[in-house]
Amino acid sequence: MTGWRRFSSIRPFEARTARTLCTAVAGASLLVGCGVLPGTSGGSKDPVTVMTWAPVGSNATNLPGMPAMAKAYARWANASGGINGHDLRVLTCNERNSSAGAADCARRAVKEKAVAVVGSYSQHGREFMAPLEAASIPYLGGYGITEEEFNSYLSYPVNGGQATLLAGNGRQLARNCDRTAMVRPDTITGDDFPDLLDSGLAQGRRGPAVDIRAAEDASDYTRTATRAREQARSGGCVTAVLGDRTETFFDSYRRLPDDGRDIRVSSVLGNIGQALVNRTGGRSGPFEGAYLTGWYPVASDPAWQPMRKVIDTYAFGDNDIDATDPGTQTTWIAYTALRAVIGAIDDGEITPGKITDTLDRGVKVDTGGLTPTLRWRYEDMPGVPGFPRIVNGDVTFQVVREGRLVAEKKGFVDVGHTLS
């Protein structure tokens, strides 16, 4: 597939240099685009410094809920004595949806002696992984939008990334649609989307989707929406994966004159969510009946209750946090993994090397039913071509009914083999 390198990075054999963590200073100054939440519990062990980054306020995709969730998690952890006696110090950085921003955040993580980058989002894998690899800093629980997250020996993904969402979306649409038109960004990252969607369609004995490119930052998609509807035809589906501009696309789509044809709409979680369904009219809106593919259980699932309690108690009314957003959810799961790793290290000092060694040796992460049990040993990786670091190939099929996102199919669907 275009843009996805068919190899994995080879782990160097040199021993990692131990790094001494800087203690948190409550009055520390903040660099532009970055913040820090110091630990507050006064634990006897050294504090653990980590970073979470995501784009905020950019002209394309924005995920402010990820750093906001990281801060809330740290408040919760530190209020109860930290993680295994360690205060959790969270740095946040605005990646700005740019290659320069991604590189700046990674260099900031190195400078601040972060022991891991946790629960973050960036489309610029080469720019952020190079500095992290040079400093041997692990990348734990990234959103999964770049190839480096599934190739780098220092990446430990908690989901199957955009690849499994798109392959899963193809599987879901193959069950319900005679023909599919796909609207995706005209970017290098977007160039991979059709092949991934088509792999799922083929698994369901459907032909390839019609590939429709669109500007990632457009303010109107009327012409694109018209073409997509024409290509889908009656009995078909239009699926759009445009990040934050997915809402703009479907706003243009719903304004098209009714032509009497039965065409369903679709996307993947993170492009459409419960908040968007609510904003656009709920059961009487354009997303009623829409098919959606996600990584995790529906937001109403009881397994999310611990996260919701933390948000309610420690987010201090932070409007950036949406408990139904998969970015927020991914950050929660990534920090759950971090907690398990630190809990398995019986030492007063936590270093990047100790974290990676613990992950590589097979620490088990129980996410309470939000994912399968996660482990990152070599034998836990099925060796999917182009995505060798995937350990969780599961997705969920969801549908909008009566204005609510509900499970279309109970439980998880493993699409890892679809990518093979």
Cite the ranges covered by each PLM segment:
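Extracellular/periplasmic periplasmic-binding protein-like sensory domains
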Residues: 253-333, 412-416
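Periplasmic-binding protein-like
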Residues: 109-122, 140-142, 180-184, 212, ...
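C-terminal motif of bacterial Sec signal peptides marking the signal peptidase cleavage site
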Residues: 30-33
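Short beta-strand elements at the ligand-binding edges of bilobed clamshell
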Residues: 94, 138, 147-172, 211-213, ...
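Extracellular/periplasmic Venus flytrap/periplasmic-binding protein
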Residues: 153-258
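Extracytoplasmic "Venus flytrap"
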Residues: 36-73, 80, 93-100, 186-191, ...
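Segments of small-molecule ligand-sensing domains
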Residues: 318-328, 339-404
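Beta-alpha junction/loop-to-helix N-cap segments that form part of ligand/metal-binding clefts
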Residues: 45, 62-68, 81-150, 216-219
